[in-house]
Every structure is written in C-alpha cells, then in structure tokens.
From Swiss-Prot:
Reactions this protein catalyses: GTP + 4 H2O = 2,5-diamino-6-hydroxy-4-(5-phosphoribosylamino)-pyrimidine + formate + 2 phosphate + 3 H(+)
Family: Belongs to the GTP cyclohydrolase II family.
Pathway: Cofactor biosynthesis; riboflavin biosynthesis; 5-amino-6-(D-ribitylamino)uracil from GTP: step 1/4
Originating species: Buchnera aphidicola subsp. Acyrthosiphon pisum (strain APS)
SUPFAM superfamilies: RibA-like
Cellular component annotations (GO), alphabetically ordered: cytosol
Gene Ontology MF term list: GTP binding; GTP cyclohydrolase II activity; zinc ion binding
The protein's name in its UniProt record: GTP cyclohydrolase-2
Keywords assigned by UniProt, alphabetized: GTP-binding, Hydrolase, Metal-binding, Nucleotide-binding, Riboflavin biosynthesis, Zinc
UniProt cofactor note: Binds 1 zinc ion per subunit.
Length: 194
C-alpha cells in the first residue's frame, strides 16, 4: 500500500483531508478521510467503512451502510479528530455485480448470508489487513473503532492494530433493512444494541 496524494475535502461536517492510497500488487485504490489532529497520544476515533455503492451513493434502504457512513463522519467531526478508511471491497468483497445478483436472490427469499453462499462466497470475503497498512502509513497506533462487527475487530487486531475500544455505531432500522440487520446479528455476530 502506498500513499499517492492528499487534498482538502469540505463536507457538511467540516473539512476533512482525503488521502488516496494504491495497493502495490494490483493498483486498487482506497481512501482515508482524516479530521483534525490525529498525531496525538490518545487513541484515534476510527471507522473502517467498506464500500457500498448502493447504500452510500444511491441511499438504498436495504442496508445500514449509508446511515453508518454519515453517522461516522458526524461522530468524528464532533470528536474533533479521527479517521475514516473507505475500504474498497464492495459487497463484503464479492464485487458490485455479484452484490446485485445477491440482491436478486434476496428478492426471492434468501437472506444476505444465504445469497452469498448460493453464489459460491462466504458470508464475508473482506480482507482488513489492507486497512492496517493505511493506519500504519498514517502513523496511527491506537484506535477506538466505530463498528458493530466483532469479525472486523478481530481481523484488525490480528493485523497488528491496537484497538483499545469498540465504539457502537447503532443506526435506526427501517422496514426494508430489518431482516438484513436481524441476519447480521444472528448469523454474523454483529452487535446491534448498545
């Protein structure tokens, strides 16, 4: 992983710096949004947010991704400093077209885990070690991680990131994502209550 460039990114929650990274092995791009001074000895409030075009850009109500992205940026801004890594592994790393296929299977009654498995994938194909590389490049040694996903905590810890606290990121359910969130809690171990 290498840092390519950084620039100012004004948002409704204040000015972030956007850092552009490139994987050396395949040229895939990732970004980190940094708010305030992260060069302190206190653990950095951090979010590793996996790419979700449908939720983040198209406001899909099928998932909680867009709401989590917005809430994370607000929380980091309110905190006064922090980092959000936008992890470019769409659809829990099955890719956009396979995610749309999984949606079609969900429309026919499968849950999100069953749909992934029907397509030949595990419930979660993501590799969080890339995010550890980004934290290291940004010289972030200790984090408070905004997540409901114990798998993410474990994978980042295994990659050498010192997570001193898991900070819940609870967003409101809606009728379109209630079954999805129930599946994430029951089958993937997500902690969806404080």
């Amino acid at each position: 992983m290498q840092l390519i460039e950084k620039a100012m990114l004004p948002t409704p929650w204040g000015n972030f710096l956007i850092f552009g990274f490139e994987e050396k092995k395949n040229g895939k791009n990732h970004v980190a949004l940094v708010y305030g001074d992260i060069k302190t000895n206190t653990p950095t409030l951090s979010r590793v947010h996996s790419e979700c075009l449908t939720g983040d850009a198209f406001f899909s109500l099928r998932c909680d991704c867009g709401s989590q992205l917005e809430m994370s940026m607000k929380r980091i801004s309110q905190e006064g400093s922090g980092v959000l890594i936008y992890h470019r592994q769409e659809g829990r790393n099955i890719g956009l077209l396979n995610k749309i296929k999984a949606y079609a299977l969900q429309d026919r009654g499968l849950d999100t885990v069953q749909a992934n498995q029907k397509l030949g994938f595990s419930a979660d194909e993501r590799d969080f070690s890339l995010c550890a590389d980004i934290f290291n490049i940004l010289n972030i040694k200790k984090i408070r991680l905004l997540t409901n996903n114990p798998f993410k905590v474990q994978m980042l810890s295994d990659a050498g990131i010192n997570i001193v606290e898991r900070v819940p990121l609870i967003v409101k359910k809606n009728p379109k994502n209630a079954y999805y969130l129930k599946t994430k809690a029951e089958k993937m171990g997500h902690l969806l209550s404080e």
